[in-house]
Design a protein with these regions (language model features):
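NTP/phosphate- and nucleic-acid-binding module
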Residues: 1-585
Length: 585
């Protein structure tokens, strides 16, 4: 490809909507263009990289015996009604009606469709195990699209589903996909960590999330450096604080004007935040989007409520619980915003974190403006409807496995695998007959990769970008080599550039020739910005048969003969183009 003929434009300025390096660089490098909020188009160079990621995924899926199919993005609502998710899924689902009023959705996921496919064709244990996958567009009506493809409304995912006769078969399929995902993300040049995760809206009995580690990620993981514990914050079990051995003091109502936050009341009363009680207020909704209850959740003042744990404790869908309208909840339950405590609350579900019964003499809101109560004790002064772990695991908290201090890291969720069991096969009637002609529900697994997210997350790795632009790994780079022709009108330089271009192409190297009539500085800046791994510069040395050879990851440039440069480029590309060299690092 010649850059002069390519649909290609770079930006010098940072687009206003871009906040993180990967989003900034993809827009500046002309890899993507914004169509609307959360909707992007892939330009030629971006599309080349995207295809390479897809092909790596296909190679690893095929190697595990998975077969590729393609299903419609438009999914009938009745399939989702069979699984029970049509009413449970929240406003993120795009719903449409056809001219006859029949409900459809733009698929945010594909469990129902794949289950429908196999229930009609798999009838015998002899047909199991089976594994099918697709790479296709997905749609979610994100309330606040941001960070480019990290949280977009239209994105590409790889869906993979395994179908087994029993849990042992599922365990084997799950292990194979765990290994395949490790290979995919390694070959793409990601620094990542598999962690235990909550199953969320997908459901099932077990899950791992693959998190690409970078400071800009929205996911937070917990891990222990002493043992093998690694988990998302949402999934992490917590060790309760040691019970306090102290006398229960009499409750004392105190005036605390204007102290609506934990920090303010702790400072005003000169107590540690650990000695306070934090309240979070919620309202829950029924299937008709009407408020059907209120919830007050209490944790120690220095902690945060873990919404995943709270949702699981209440047995509600994550879309059916939101922060309460405090004015309405005050009228119904007696709470007061900023001064809510458990004493005096009524007509709401009270959830207490599991460590609260062991603490003594806490400061809590008095359910009265500008007042708190000192020396509030669980059991004597208040009780909860549910006592369960609903707190986040904090940095430095003891590991629930070995007791060593927990560490936190941020990252981007690029993939997740689930043990679905019979969550979908039972309600949808996907069964098989065993050797004795007895019917059993098919045992399923679900495995997803965010292809769009992976595309962007690669750049957010610290080693894959710098102040000048992208540094693509060879395995996913749009081209392996860029030839920068300094003077296209110079006959000798042009002949040398053409020779390199032709010989590299014949050797299977993907090469782009920058033959634009631009200033050398513009060409160098663009080559750095788009991140092609190898740059060969053809300039004044061409008359003596010399070129300049530079790796994008390295600062040094070396002068080589034309033949040496060609040979070195071919050797480097062949060693790195499939990404398997990362396994040796």
């Amino acid at each position: 490809m010649r850059l002069s003929k390519s649909f290609f434009k770079t930006l010098r300025e940072v687009p206003n909507e871009a906040e993180i390096p990967s989003h900034i660089l993809l827009l500046r490098a002309g890899m993507i263009k914004k169509t609307a909020a959360g909707i992007y188009s892939y330009m030629p160079m971006g599309r080349r990289t995207f295809r390479k990621i897809e092909n790596i995924i296909r190679e690893e899926m095929d190697a595990k015996g998975a077969q590729e199919i393609s299903t419609s993005v438009l999914q009938p609502g009745e399939l989702w009604e069979e699984s029970g998710r049509w009413s449970a899924y929240g406003p993120e689902m795009w719903r449409v009606n056809d001219r006859n009023g029949r409900g459809f959705c733009l698929g945010p996921t594909a469990e129902e469709v794949f289950t429908d496919i196999i229930r009609n064709d798999i009838t015998s244990y002899r047909q199991l195990p089976m594994m099918l996958y697709q790479i296709t567009d997905k749609f979610r009506d994100e309330a606040r699209p941001r960070f480019g493809m990290m949280r977009s409304r239209d994105f590409v995912m790889k869906d993979n589903y395994s179908f087994d006769r029993d849990e042992a078969g599922l365990d084997e399929s799950y292990r194979m996909m765990y290994d395949a995902y490790t290979n995919v993300f390694t070959r793409c040049g990601l620094t990542f960590r598999p962690v235990e995760a909550d199953n969320g809206a997908i459901g099932g009995t077990g899950s791992h999330e693959f998190t690409a580690l970078c400071e800009y990620g929205e996911s937070e993981i917990c891990y222990c450096e002493k043992c093998d514990l690694a988990t998302t914050v949402e999934k992490a079990a917590c060790v309760d604080a040691e019970p306090v051995e102290a006398e229960m003091l009499p409750m004392e109502k105190v005036n605390t004007p204007g102290t609506k936050t934990i920090e303010e009341v702790a400072d005003y009363l000169q107590v540690d935040k650990k000695q306070t009680l934090k309240a979070l207020l919620f309202e829950t909704y029924d299937e008709d989007d009407k408020v059907n209850g209120y919830v007050a959740a209490f944790v120690r003042g220095d902690r945060e409520v873990n919404m995943t744990k709270l949702v699981n404790a209440l047995g509600v869908h994550e879309y059916a619980i939101v922060f309460a309208d405090e004015e309405k909840m005050s009228e119904k339950c007696g709470c007061v915003g900023g001064f809510t405590g458990p004493v005096g609350l009524h007509d709401c579900t009270i959830v207490a974190d599991s460590e609260l019964p062991g603490l003594k003499n806490l400061v809590a809101g008095a359910c009265e403006e500008d007042y708190h109560i000192k020396n509030v004790n669980y059991g004597r002064d208040w009780e909860a409807d549910t006592v369960v772990d609903i707190k986040n695991l904090l940095e430095g908290d003891p590991c629930p496995v070995c007791g060593a201090p927990i560490r936190h890291a941020r990252g981007v969720e690029v993939g997740q695998i689930f043990k679905l069991g019979t969550k979908y096969s039972e309600p949808m009637g996907a069964t098989f007959k065993d050797e004795n002609q007895k019917d059993h529900p098919i045992v399923m697994g679900c495995y997803g990769i965010g292809v769009s997210r992976t595309f962007q997350a690669i750049i957010d790795m610290p080693e894959n970008h710098d102040e000048n632009g992208i540094i693509w790994p060879m395995s996913v780079a749009p081209y392996h080599v860029i030839i920068t022709l300094m003077k296209p009108d110079d006959e000798v330089q042009a002949q040398v550039a053409e020779k390199i271009y032709d010989e590299l192409g014949r050797a299977g190297v993907e090469v782009i020739l920058d033959d634009r009539k631009e200033r050398p500085g513009v060409k160098f800046k663009d080559s750095e910005l788009i991140g092609i791994p190898i740059r060969i510069t053809v300039g004044r040395g061409a008359a003596d048969g010399m070129i300049e050879y530079k790796m994008r990851r390295e600062a040094d440039k070396v002068e080589l003969s034309v033949d040496e440069g060609i040979a070195k480029a071919i050797e480097t590309v062949n060693a790195e183009k499939d990404g398997r060299h990362f396994f040796n690092k």
